[in-house]
């Protein structure tokens, strides 16, 4: 599967304006991340790890990762002593979706506490997401949506609408998370493949 994705990426780099190739790439990336990189991570320093019930140490000896990106960040948290405490999917934040107007629950990817070089202790809530799913906002805070497909087939329109809905849902989640963090003394951040250092 990794070989297939690399070949599609190679074709896409030669044809960056091809909507069809881009959609195929996103499809295979979603399959690859969901079906081939889920698993259980066993932290080498479980005393730093907290699970959804607040248990630490020996009671938190396995953690589920849902993408290779999450696995890479788990290894980072586990390795460095500057990360004092961390956990995956330990915080639930209620939010109102822009798509259906209903209340849902957002389970954040990571919680961690770190000691910065200055000695300051900072608490973070972190989301790991592809850059393509990260909404860009204008100066008024409105989402900048991707251009609609030039080929107006129903399939292309559905794919475009789905991508727009993903941006709207993520914006709803992250706005709620930012409010929660301001109220509780946390910092909210979103990491993409660029920050994690993953290349396709």
Task: List where the protein language model places each region.
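Electrostatic, structured charged patches in enzyme active sites and in nucleic-acid/phosphate-binding
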Residues: 4, 8, 16-17, 21-200
């Amino acid at each position: 599967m990794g070989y297939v994705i690399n070949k599609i990426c190679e074709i896409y780099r030669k044809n960056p304006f091809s909507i069809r190739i881009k959609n195929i790439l996103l499809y295979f990336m979603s399959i690859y991340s969901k079906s081939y990189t889920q698993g259980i991570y066993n932290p080498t320093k479980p005393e730093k790890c907290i699970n959804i019930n607040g248990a630490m140490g020996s009671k938190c000896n396995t953690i589920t990762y849902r993408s290779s990106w999450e696995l890479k960040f788990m290894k980072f948290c586990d390795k460095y002593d500057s990360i004092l405490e961390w956990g995956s999917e330990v915080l639930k934040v209620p939010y109102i979706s822009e798509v259906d107007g209903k209340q849902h629950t957002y389970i954040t990817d990571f919680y961690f506490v770190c000691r910065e070089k200055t000695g300051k202790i900072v608490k973070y809530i972190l989301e790991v997401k592809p850059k393509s799913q990260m909404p860009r906002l204008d100066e008024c805070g409105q989402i900048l949506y991707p251009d609609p497909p030039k080929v107006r087939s129903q399939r292309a329109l559905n794919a475009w609408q789905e991508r727009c809905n993903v941006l709207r849902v993520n914006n709803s989640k992250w706005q709620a998370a930012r409010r929660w963090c301001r109220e509780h003394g946390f910092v909210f951040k979103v990491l993409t493949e660029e920050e994690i250092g993953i290349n396709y």
